[in-house]
UniProtKB/Swiss-Prot annotation:
A motif ('HIGH' region) lies at residues 130-140. The keyword Transmembrane does not apply. It comes from Staphylococcus aureus (strain Mu3 / ATCC 700698). This is Arginine--tRNA ligase. SUPFAM superfamilies: Anticodon-binding domain of a subclass of class I aminoacyl-tRNA synthetases, Arginyl-tRNA synthetase (ArgRS), N-terminal 'additional' domain, Nucleotidylyl transferase.
Length: 553
């Protein structure tokens, strides 16, 4: 239990003890305490006096006074109590309890903020999963940044997380990729008789694959059409995936599993789920096609599994894939989908229900669109290539840190304008610069302290920390673990980014209000330890969203 929860629990226990002591109730109702909207009204407040009115048959202000008179303020860490309005009790805490967070942060280091106890739940988090048919773009970048941050947050909160990328290496898009490579392969050999498929890929990278294969493997031209296309499928996917993996690694995004769609066919899992759904009575034949009764499970219409030409829809392998996730022992399945996949939510959930799997175990987050902005105008095409702007170009333009930070600043279900000019600014208007500068500033102060012979130690007299800005800063440090737990519970990576901004702001305010290094050696030691706790917290929080914490800027 974190220090904030400990103090809240102690306060509730002491309020209950006070009610007993005052003889106000034989059975005490739930005591709810909350943080007042206005900090002038204390650190915590409760309406328990009004709740007890009918039980105690007394005026709520009288009840409130009886609670105040019988409260052990020392145990409750309370220095002042006010009774407000009809009977609200406002508590002002003796904030010295907050200084306990300093040695805790220093001792735990890069594990500070992490929940020690495992929640005992396995989470499979699938994100990015872009088709291996071209470069990653800004939508994939948001998916990667949010997905990787969410994996870090869930891990810190005690979940067992597996990060997975689903490789769409089967189906029509890969056939079109192979046909496109075939066209460019023969063009490079001087044969223009192979036309591009209607939905073919004509990007520069696909042209380069064709040329490269013509140069290195001209013998492919003599293969049968079936063997040739099989080779182009394999080599095309390998080439594209190698490029995607390289870009994602540079974007500080890593995966535990790369799951191939083709493996579902090879292992017979698609036929297995199809047979199982038929056996359970959830499929039927109509118009020459095979359908799944997803309307039995709140979908708006039934879905086709096998088309009337005998080919599978995309839905069937997706069902097999998600059932495979369940079979692997995962308790929670989280998918991050692009905005164009919104209609997939109900049908996927319905498909799990056909197997008796609680569809609430599947959580789908929809990533809304990102617009790249420059000088107030949307930038749709690359100035260099004339094509859609790629993840690599974004990394080259603004850097990995800025891209990761900006893409996790907003809830993924909201549209986001990515201001590339702001992301490059070295000013406090740039959110990532503002946060990283706070870390670098602390490192500079710690270096000065060391030069003066003052080492960071968790064993200090922290009673010298009385400045209001210092107390507010410590409150923010103490709020790190609750923020992680909240971000994990709500699957909200942007809560960490918001926290980083607040923590950096509180540090800058403290820095501007009070000198860290003073002639008072005991106070200086306490302040040095405190800002080390802040530095650790900042670094850990930045790491959660995949951003570095530089020691100098």
């Amino acid at each position: 239990m974190n220090i904030i929860d400990q103090v809240k629990q102690t306060l509730v226990e002491e309020i209950a003890a006070s009610i007993n002591k005052a003889g106000l109730a034989d059975e005490i109702p739930d005591i709810k305490i909350e943080v007042p909207k206005d900090t002038k009204n204390g650190d915590y407040a409760t309406n328990i006096a009004m709740v007890l009115t009918k039980i105690a048959k007394r005026n709520p202000r009288e009840i409130a006074q009886a609670i105040v008179d019988n409260l052990d303020t020392e145990k409750a860490h309370v220095k002042q109590i006010d009774i407000a309005g009809p009977g609200f009790i406002n508590f002002y805490l003796d904030n010295q309890y907050l200084t306990a967070i300093i040695p805790e942060a220093i001792e735990k280091g890069d594990q500070f903020g992490h929940v020690n106890e495992s929640k005992g739940q396995n989470v499979l988090l699938e994100y990015v999963s872009a088709n291996p048919t071209g470069d990653l773009h800004i939508g994939h970048a948001r998916n990667a940044a949010v997905g990787d941050a969410l994996a870090n947050i869930l891990t810190a909160a005690g979940y067992n997380v597996t990060r997975e990328y689903y490789i769409n290496d089967a189906g029509n898009q890969i056939t079109n990729l192979a046909r496109s490579i075939e066209t460019h392969f023969f063009e490079a050999l001087g044969d223009n008789s192979y036309s591009m498929p209607e939905d073919g890929y004509n990007g520069k990278d696909i042209i380069e694959i064709g040329k490269d294969l013509a140069e290195k493997h001209p013998e492919i031209k003599d293969y049968s059409e079936e063997a040739r296309l099989k080779e182009f499928r394999k080599l095309g996917v390998e080439y594209e995936m190698a490029k995607l993996k390289n870009d994602l690694a540079e974007f500080n995004t890593h995966f535990d599993n790369w799951f191939s769609e083709t493996s579902l066919y090879e292992k017979g899992e698609i036929l297995e789920v199809l047979a199982k759904m038929k056996e359970l009575g959830y499929t039927y034949e109509a118009d020459g096609a095979t359908w799944l009764r997803t309307t039995d499970f709140k979908d708006d219409k039934d879905r086709v599994l096998i088309k009337n030409d005998g080919t599978y829809t995309y839905f069937l392998p997706d069902i097999a894939y998600h059932f495979d996730k369940v079979k692997r022992g995962n308790d929670i399945l989280i998918d991050l989908f692009g905005a164009d996949h919104h209609g997939y939510i109900n049908r996927l959930k319905a498909s799990l229900e056909t197997f008796g799997v609680d569809s609430n175990r599947l959580e789908i987050q929809i990533m809304q669109m990102v617009r790249l902005m420059e000088n107030g105008k949307e930038v749709k095409m690359s100035k260099r290539t004339g094509n859609a702007i790629t993840l690599r170009e974004i990394m080259d333009e603004v850097g990995v840190d800025a891209a990761r930070y900006f893409l996790t600043m907003r809830s993924p279900d909201s549209h986001f304008d990515f201001d590339m000019e702001l992301a490059k600014e070295q000013s406090q208007d740039n959110p990532v610069y503002y946060a990283q500068y706070a870390h670098a500033r602390i490192c500079s102060i710690l270096k000065q302290a060391k030069e003066q012979g003052i080492e960071v130690t968790a064993a200090n007299d922290f009673t010298t920390i009385t400045n209001e800005k210092a107390i507010e800063l410590l409150k923010k440090v103490a709020d790190f673990e609750p923020t992680i737990e909240s971000a994990a519970e709500h699957r909200s990576a942007h809560r960490i980014t918001n926290y980083i901004q607040d923590l950096a702001a509180h540090f800058h305010k403290f820095y501007n209000a009070e000198k860290v290094l003073t002639d008072d050696i005991e106070k200086t030691k306490a302040h040095v330890a405190m800002i080390e706790a802040v530095r650790i917290t900042l670094k850990n929080a930045l790491a959660m969203v995949g951003v570095s914490a530089p020691e100098s800027m």
